[in-house]
Amino acid sequence: MARLSWGYGEHNGPIHWNELFPIADGDQQSPIEIKTKEVKYDSSLRPLSIKYDPASAKIISNSGHSFNVDFDDTEDKSVLRGGPLTGNYRLRQFHLHWGSADDHGSEHVVDGVRYAAELHVVHWNSDKYPSFVEAAHESDGLAVLGVFLQIGEHNPQLQKITDILDSIKEKGKQTRFTNFDPLCLLPSSWDYWTYPGSLTVPPLLESVTWIVLKQPISISSQQLARFRSLLCTAEGESAAFLLSNHRPPQPLKGRRVRASFY
């Protein structure tokens, strides 16, 4: 398997990632199954403080592994603070994970329940590190907000994204995408679970403070089908759809999951 060819297929999927990225078998890998009976409420966890500047959204691209919406992270325009975090974490990008059918697709699992999809909003510690790339190698470098998507009502907040997918259908395509506030994709309750973990895609670096929101948002079956119409192949290659892009839960290995709520 060539270094750049990891994916979600039979021959390059998550069970093969350790061949190129040995940390795949590390002690702080993500995602995990959250077992609510084993979670501890922690009264020291603060509420989340989130301020995003819609004008800092820049481009949407097809990485071949998902779509990414990238933000201008040259200054603290869009930041996540509070919760389990110390200092400011600057918004870098968000992307989505889904499955080949509506009954699975989320990366984190809660008491055996798999949601249809999972949004990841990625931030980096701009108080301590000069760039995302450097922060990604430090244990307190990244903070990822995870939001579950559950099949239900059509979600108008996703429309701007689904409407533009045709212009980034092939891997490597990108287009301008601005005036978007990811806050509109968060549920009304910001109750969360938190634990130390990793990126869920290679290079799988163990530098993430995970903040997984308990309350899901809705997505219709038709909207979710739009994401499966993206290709994991570039223009000129034999076309293959990105039907599924989620990593299964990894062993907890003694880590503690804390809750901000009873």
Curated annotation (Swiss-Prot):
Record-linked InterPro entries: CA_dom (IPR001148), CA_dom_sf (IPR036398), Carbonic_anhydrase_a-class (IPR023561), Carbonic_anhydrase_a-class_CS (IPR018338)
Binding residues annotated for Zn(2+), in chain numbering: 95, 97, 120
Cofactor dependence: Zn(2+)
Top EC class for this record: lyase
Family matches, as CDD domains: alpha_CA_I_II_III_XIII
UniProt keyword terms in alphabetical order: Lyase, Metal-binding, Zinc
Binding site residues for substrate: 200-201
GO CC annotation terms, alphabetical: cytosol; intracellular membrane-bounded organelle; myelin sheath
Pfam families xref list: Carb_anhydrase
Catalytic activity: hydrogencarbonate + H(+) = CO2 + H2O
Active-site feature positions: 65 (proton donor/acceptor)
SMART domains in the cross-refs: Carb_anhydrase
GO molecular-function terms, A-Z: carbonate dehydratase activity; zinc ion binding
Tissue specificity note: Expressed in spleen, lung, kidney, heart, brain, skeletal muscle and testis.
Control of this protein's activity: Inhibited by coumarins, sulfonamide derivatives such as acetazolamide (AZA) and Foscarnet (phosphonoformate trisodium salt).
Stated family: Belongs to the alpha-carbonic anhydrase family.
Protein's job: Reversible hydration of carbon dioxide.
Name this polypeptide is given: Carbonic anhydrase 13
Higher taxonomy: Eukaryota, Metazoa, Chordata, Craniata, Vertebrata
